[in-house]
Amino acid sequence: CKQSCSFGPFTFVCDGNTK
């Protein structure tokens, strides 16, 4: 499943253990 992850000033999608 995909969830929204915030990393510093960047926002990316995390797919399982893959970021």
Curated annotation (Swiss-Prot):
PTM summary: Maturation of lantibiotics involves the enzymatic conversion of Thr, and Ser into dehydrated AA and the formation of thioether bonds with cysteine or the formation of dialkylamine bonds with lysine. This is followed by membrane translocation and cleavage of the modified precursor.
Cross-link (Lanthionine (Ser-Cys)): S4-C14
Cross-link (Beta-methyllanthionine (Cys-Thr)): C1-T18, C5-T11
GO cellular component: extracellular region
Residues bearing the modification (3R)-3-hydroxyaspartate: D15
Protein's UniProt keywords contain Cytoplasm: no
Record family assignment: Belongs to the type B lantibiotic family.
Function: Is a potent inhibitor of human phospholipase A2.
Protein name in the entry: Lantibiotic duramycin
Organism in which the protein naturally occurs: Streptomyces griseoverticillatus (Streptoverticillium griseoverticillatum)
